[in-house]
Swiss-Prot record:
It catalyses: 4 Fe(II)-[cytochrome c] + O2 + 8 H(+)(in) = 4 Fe(III)-[cytochrome c] + 2 H2O + 4 H(+)(out). Keywords: Copper, Electron transport, Magnesium, Membrane, Metal-binding, Mitochondrion, Mitochondrion inner membrane, Respiratory chain, Translocase, Transmembrane, Transmembrane helix, Transport. It comes from Chlorocebus aethiops (Green monkey). This is Cytochrome c oxidase subunit 2. It holds the Pfam family COX2. Binds a dinuclear copper A center per subunit. Cu cation A1 binds at residues 161, 196, 200, 207.
Length: 227
C-alpha cells in the first residue's frame, strides 16, 4: 500500500504490476538519459564557442536525428505493447466477480457463489478505529483469493466510474450499459486499497475500494465477508 510522502510506485502484488514497474523504470531511465544529453548540448552551446553559423547543409546529422529518435520510440513501444497485451489477456479464470459503480459506492456480486450481492460504502470518520485509514476504509471489503486468476466484470448503474487498485495494476472504467472485464492473479495476501479514478460527481473522492486477499484454500471453503 501507499505510505506518507511516498515518491515511487506501490509494491507489486500481481505479475502485471511487476511488469509495469519494470517498464516504468526502463522508460524513466531512457527519458532521463535523453534529457541529460539535450541539456548538456544546450549548456555547451551557451557556454562555449563550438558553433559554426556558416553551416547550411548537414544531411548526415539530419538523418541521424530522424532515425535515432524513431529507434528509441520503437524500443519503448515494444515492451509497452507487450504489457498492454498482458493486461487484456483473459484465459480460463477460476473465479468471476462483478463490480457495479454507483454514486457513490460499489456493489459486488459473486456470480460463482449463488449470486451473493452486497454493497460497499466508505466508513465515515466517526466509525473509524485506531489505525484505520481516513477516506479509504469501507464497511464491506471485497474478498478475493490469491494464486488464482480472478476475472472482474465492471459496469456502472449511473455515470462513469473507474475501478482501480494500484498495487494490483488494475484500472478499468465502469461505463453505464457496457460490461468491461479485466483479470489478475494476486501473489500475496493482505488488504489493499484503491479509489474510483474517474470524476463522477460531488462525492467522487468518497467511494474507496478495499480488497482483502486471502489464501486460495481458505477462499475455496467459502468466501469470508465482513458483512
Amino acid at each position: 500500500m501507499a505510505h506518507p510522502v511516498q515518491l515511487g510506485l506501490q509494491d507489486a502484488t500481481s505479475p502485471v504490476m511487476e511488469e509495469l514497474i519494470t517498464f516504468h523504470d526502463y522508460a524513466l531511465m531512457t527519458i532521463s538519459l535523453i534529457s541529460f544529453l539535450v541539456l548538456y548540448a544546450l549548456f555547451s552551446t551557451l557556454t562555449t564557442k563550438l558553433t559554426n553559423t556558416n553551416i547550411t547543409d548537414a544531411q548526415e546529422m539530419e538523418t541521424t536525428w530522424t532515425i535515432l529518435p524513431a529507434v528509441i520510440l520503437i524500443l519503448i513501444a515494444l515492451p509497452s505493447l507487450r504489457i498492454l497485451y498482458l493486461t487484456d489477456e483473459i484465459n480460463n479464470p477460476s473465479f468471476t466477480i462483478k463490480s457495479i459503480g454507483h454514486q457513490w459506492y460499489w456493489t459486488y456480486e459473486y456470480t460463482d457463489y449463488g449470486g451473493l450481492i452486497f454493497n460497499s460504502y466508505m466508513l465515515p470518520p466517526l466509525f473509524l478505529n485506531p489505525g484505520d485509514l481516513r477516506l479509504l476504509e469501507v464497511d464491506n471489503r471485497v474478498v478475493l483469493p490469491i494464486e488464482a486468476p480472478v476475472r472482474m466484470m465492471i459496469t456502472s448503474q449511473d455515470v462513469l466510474h473507474s475501478w482501480t487498485i494500484p498495487t494490483l495494476g488494475l484500472k478499468t472504467d465502469a461505463v453505464p450499459g457496457r460490461l468491461n472485464q479485466t483479470t489478475f492473479t494476486a501473489t500475496r495476501p493482505g488488504v489493499y486499497y484503491g479509489q474510483c479514478s474517474e470524476i463522477c460527481g460531488a462525492n467522487h473522492s468518497f467511494m474507496p475500494i478495499v480488497a482483502e486477499l486471502i489464501p486460495l484454500k481458505i477462499f475455496e471453503m467459502g468466501p469470508v465477508f465482513t458483512l
